[in-house]
Curated annotation (Swiss-Prot):
Gene responsible for this protein: foxj1.2
Presence of keyword Nucleus: yes
Localization annotation: Nucleus
Described purpose of this protein according to its UniProt entry: Key transcription factor required for motile ciliogenesis. Activates genes essential for motile cilia formation and function.
Recorded superkingdom: Eukaryota
Protein's organism: Xenopus laevis (African clawed frog)
Chief location of this protein within or outside the cell: nucleus
UniProt keyword list: Activator, Cilium biogenesis/degradation, DNA-binding, Nucleus, Transcription, Transcription regulation
GO cellular component assignments: nucleus
Annotated GO MF terms: DNA-binding transcription factor activity, RNA polymerase II-specific; RNA polymerase II cis-regulatory region sequence-specific DNA binding
Name assigned to this protein: Forkhead box protein J1.2
């Protein structure tokens, strides 16, 4: 690569003509005076970049010239060019100006109304003040409230009556004047520290009560459980008839387990347990089938019981004397012997709607009673 030096400089007339013709192009005249042999890298690193002249073209290289965009790298060394930044003026924090609230009527005091009341009570020797005395102390010590709208007095009254830190003390008979006094409640006296009324944090039990403590009334689909309801018996026509076991309601099986244990806690509905309202048609059909079967079984049972009682009375009229009646008083009757003990159905413990489909039909249950 030929090295440009001063010996290759063109005549001055030719340079002037080229400058006139190529004013729109980037000026590269500094390349003619550049020589790699005479350059000092240390001086280039410490020197500031030259300020472009007005006559020079734009600083960005022309399109397609990628040589000036990226400098060659030698190994892993990196040359950093320090730039001499002008020292920026540092913003010094402005000193906080103390405001005299007794004379300055344009600045509102940064205290709450409850704090103002506490400050007035602390300044008093008796630690109890009337409402008018609290007004006077605030207006004397804070000029803002002297010229402000008198609506702030309503806020003072509301804080005295609603804030639990203040309590009203009745006026004694020997004390002149009208109205009662206001003072701080001794239980909350520790909240007023260094002229500021602090607020206590609510305990976690009040902020997040457990959801399981919510109780509900009887659900319309849940049967009301009564103690001893499964052991009651009906007496009809001189013969005792055992009461059939109540079938569980298949509408809401998820609520039956808490009800059997006597628990009234609210349990959220689980959509996987089949208690959604989408299955109301199927559940209503199952309930109607169960009720029809129960009615048919009860009618057949009542007719069979009545016929058996009439047959016994017609067949054994001469044997009903006092001696036979007394001898059979401690024994079980024929119908009691025939009766089978009512066993609690296993599906009452599970709570699935599908158990209703596998229940024995009503005509088979009638045969067991005969």
């Amino acid at each position: 690569m030929p090295v440009l030096s001063t010996t290759h400089r063109l005549p001055l007339s030719v340079e002037r003509e080229r400058n006139r013709e190529d004013d729109s192009l980037t000026n590269l005249q500094w390349l003619q005076d550049f020589s790699i042999l005479s350059t000092d890298l240390s001086s280039i690193a410490n020197s500031r970049p030259p300020v472009p002249r007005v006559s020079q073209g734009p600083c960005s290289p022309p399109a397609g010239d990628t040589a000036s965009c990226q400098a060659p790298r030698t190994g892993k060394q990196r040359v950093t060019v320090p730039t001499a930044w002008a020292s920026l003026p540092t913003l010094s924090p402005s000193p906080v100006q103390e405001v005299d609230y007794r004379t300055n009527a344009n600045v509102k005091p940064p205290y709450s109304y409850a704090t103002l009341i506490c400050m007035a009570m602390e300044a008093s020797q008796q630690r109890k003040l009337t409402l008018s005395a609290i007004y006077n102390w605030i207006t004397q010590n804070f000029c803002y409230y002297r010229h402000a709208d008198p609506s702030w007095q309503n806020s003072i009254r509301h804080n005295l009556s609603l804030n639990k830190c203040f309590m009203k003390v009745p006026r004694g008979k020997d004390e002149p004047g009208k109205g009662g006094f206001w003072q701080m409640d001794p239980r909350y006296a520790d909240m007023f520290v260094n002229g500021v009324l602090k607020r206590r944090r609510m305990p976690s039990s009040h902020l997040d009560p457990p959801r399981c403590n919510k109780t509900i009334g009887h659900h319309p689909y849940l049967p009301v459980s009564r103690p001893g309801s499964h052991h009651m018996q009906h007496i009809s026509g001189g013969h005792r008839q055992s009461r059939r076991y109540e079938k569980p309601n298949p509408v809401l099986p998820a609520f039956r387990a808490p009800e059997r244990q006597g628990d009234t806690l609210f349990t959220p509905e689980d959509p996987l347990q089949g208690s959604n309202f989408d299955d109301l048609d199927l559940q209503a059909a199952l309930i109607s089938m169960c009720w029809e079967g129960d009615l048919a079984a009860s009618n057949l049972n009542s007719t069979l019981t009545g016929n058996s009682g009439m047959d016994m009375n017609q067949q054994d009229p001469p044997m009903q004397d006092n001696h036979w009646y007394l001898s059979t008083e401690g024994q079980q009757t024929w119908e009691q012997v025939k009766e089978e003990p009512v066993v609690e159905q296993w599906y009452s413990e599970t709570g699935f709607v599908e158990d209703v489909l596998y229940e024995c039909p009503p005509w088979e249950r009638v045969e067991t009673l005969l």
